[in-house]
């Protein structure tokens, strides 16, 4: 099974993907590194620009028949069996990105993306099998156990469990000033 772990930057994709792969006995693949290795991604100003169709070809060709947890912001655009969209309170996203040294503009963009369900909507547009998981106030172990429980119980689609519209007023500082 090829499982994509995706979400807004700062949501905890890598931590969860590595732990999930370990618990399931699956291979862990970082999509960014995979893209660079296959020559369909290049670094520009610290970010990797990827040719999506070319990357999807390599994912299909080399990973499709293996048990893999695919970690990456664009993993929901790849040919996978299941997409897990991690969600976190937008304030948490903003704080984590500020700690990582993101610009105010990038913090605002990513907080807004989380607020309006951008990654979830993209995942639903691409795949039938999408599971949304709210990571807010949960440990990585709790999150992974929730994901494994959903997979083992046969859940293929669980979306619409997160609604940040009620916290919009609290999030305005992150949209305007990157959290300051």
Curated annotation (Swiss-Prot):
Reaction(s) the record says it catalyses: AMP + ATP = 2 ADP; ATP + H2O = ADP + phosphate + H(+)
EC class: transferase
Binding site for ATP: 10, 12-15, 100, 138
Residue ranges of the region described as LID: 99-109
GO molecular function: adenylate kinase activity; ATP binding; ATP hydrolysis activity
Keyword terms, alphabetized: ATP-binding, Kinase, Nucleotide-binding, Ribosome biogenesis, rRNA processing, Transferase
Membrane-spanning parts: none
E.C. code: 2.7.4.3
InterPro entries reported for this sequence: Adenyl_kinase_AK6, P-loop_NTPase
Region called NMP, residue ranges: 30-50
Alphabetical GO biological process terms: ribosomal small subunit biogenesis; rRNA processing
Any one Pfam family match given in the protein's UniProt record, by short name: AAA_18
Complexes and interactors: Interacts with uS11. Not a structural component of 40S pre-ribosomes, but transiently interacts with them by binding to uS11.
Family designation: Belongs to the adenylate kinase family. AK6 subfamily.
Cross-referenced PANTHER family: ADENYLATE KINASE ISOENZYME 6, POS9-ACTIVATING FACTOR FAP7-RELATED
Database matches in NCBIfam families: PRK03839.1
Function: Broad-specificity nucleoside monophosphate (NMP) kinase that catalyzes the reversible transfer of the terminal phosphate group between nucleoside triphosphates and monophosphates. Also has ATPase activity. Involved in the late maturation steps of the 30S ribosomal particles, specifically 16S rRNA maturation. While NMP activity is not required for ribosome maturation, ATPase activity is. Associates transiently with small ribosomal subunit protein uS11. ATP hydrolysis breaks the interaction with uS11.
Protein name per Swiss-Prot or TrEMBL: Putative adenylate kinase
Organism whose genome encodes this protein: Pyrococcus abyssi (strain GE5 / Orsay)
């Amino acid at each position: 099974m090829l499982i994509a772990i995706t979400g807004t930057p700062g949501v905890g994709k890598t931590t969860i993907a590595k732990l999930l792969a370990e618990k399931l006995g699956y291979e862990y693949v970082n999509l960014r590194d995979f893209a660079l290795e296959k020559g369909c991604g290049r670094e520009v100003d610290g970010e990797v620009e990827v040719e999506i169709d070319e990357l999807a070809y390599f994912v299909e060709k080399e990973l499709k028949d293996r048990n893999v947890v695919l970690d990456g912001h664009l993993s929901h655009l790849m040919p996978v069996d299941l997409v897990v969209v991690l969600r976190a309170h937008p304030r948490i996203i903003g704080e984590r990105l500020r700690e990582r040294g993101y610009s105010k503009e990038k913090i605002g963009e990513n907080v807004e993306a989380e607020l309006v369900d951008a990654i979830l909507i993209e995942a639903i547009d691409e795949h039938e099998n999408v599971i949304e998981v709210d990571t807010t106030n949960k440990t990585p172990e709790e999150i992974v156990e929730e994901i494994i429980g959903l997979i083992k119980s046969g859940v293929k689609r669980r979306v619409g469990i997160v609604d940040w519209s009620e916290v919009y007023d609290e999030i305005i500082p992150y949209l305007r000033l990157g959290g300051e």
